[in-house]
């Protein structure tokens, strides 16, 4: 299949860019963007490669994404080696095909076509690309955003190429994301022999009523844009491995995916009040990985919906479900942020794949969005 979007996707997949190793993907993109007049700024932090590229001036539309991928897992279970892209029955297989090298290729090709047709476009077209999204995400988009904000860079609209679609490309657009807050909690007791419980203080027994009450809380009921806040226990550990030792500590890790009905401080206050109610001795460490954000109907959402309706003749759902993305960092700049990408059914799985025709369609959608906002 001869198609610039498919060919570039295959070239990117061949580079095993396990997070945060870019493996040459960004150099490939930069070469293409430089040829059509983009100014490139490398913004590397630590072991992470990032770049910010722009063309033109004025109202700014940025395309954001990541070149890194998750590990392939058991390569023997793949129908083809994960970093050797292959097309079977119209599906392009390879690690990163859907998440998100296909989107990156569609962005670049869309930009090439857009610039060819609008060499003197009125707004500014930009790219914000990182090699650290799948792992810690500490030296990637968040650091670039901080640097851009420090020098008062303008960012009006941002399209993140995360695989938002569920069944056909464009059926779901993410116009926001829930916040994510993790609690690392240690309940302190006194270690001892199980035969002499009066000489010990079992933190598991102590914590059980607290945990029972915690998991039963209805945090909120969501709103028109967000589902209800959820809390899930992710890890729980205690004991020495011996059946005759009362543990001295219990570690519990739980995560909140929260709506705009709450703030992280409100959640923390309620958890601390519950700990005090149950008279527990504890230490706690909180990690806020992202605040909730929402892009209401406006120029960006309207342009995205228009592009999908034009090329796929469907009306997309605007949702805020799912995990976090780098959009949470970009939203801090005051930009309208939307996620539109391919079908996510196989992301992070063995035999990750994407419909090759969908990538061609995605490139046309991206180009139409550019034309509506910065042509």
Swiss-Prot record:
Zn(2+) 2 binds at residues 99, 134, 348. GO terms for cellular component: cytosol. It catalyses: N-succinyl-(2S,6S)-2,6-diaminopimelate + H2O = (2S,6S)-2,6-diaminopimelate + succinate. The keyword Metal-binding applies. SUPFAM superfamilies: Bacterial exopeptidase dimerisation domain, Zn-dependent exopeptidases. Keywords: Amino-acid biosynthesis, Cobalt, Diaminopimelate biosynthesis, Dipeptidase, Hydrolase, Lysine biosynthesis, Manganese, Metal-binding, Metalloprotease, Protease, Zinc. Homodimer. Catalyzes the hydrolysis of N-succinyl-L,L-diaminopimelic acid (SDAP), forming succinate and LL-2,6-diaminopimelate (DAP), an intermediate involved in the bacterial biosynthesis of lysine and meso-diaminopimelic acid, an essential component of bacterial cell walls. Can also hydrolyze all N-terminal Asp dipeptides except Asp-Pro. Asp-Ser is the best substrate, followed by Asp-Gly, Asp-Leu, and Asp-Cys. This is Succinyl-diaminopimelate desuccinylase.
